[in-house]
Amino acid sequence: LLARIKQLLTLFSSEAENQLISAAQIQQLVAAHYASANFSISYLADNFHVSIAYMSYLFKKEMGENFSDYVWALRLGKAKELLLNTDMSIDDISLAVGYVNTSSFRRKFKQATGMTPSQLRG
């Protein structure tokens, strides 16, 4: 019984603390770090002092989509902007939006847009 009470108290206190995490706070942190190749849900969880599972739940609840889809959309948007408005190489753009593996970036870009980065650039 004591173990169950302790478990419930931990859960409730954790949830109460985490209610203080807002969508704006999440967006601010994601916007500041999405281009880092090491950026992950665990980084967010560590920053907000919550578990990865809870951060995943909270992210989806607050942002309306899962972490990886949200970050990919940011990276894709920035990549398109750089392709259309700069003369940066595709390799440099890949790195600038958080992809160390350019092949992976090109493949994912084509899956998302139906064209390669070079085709978008024209």
Descriptions of predicted regions:
Residues S22:
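N-terminal pre-P-loop "Q-motif" helix
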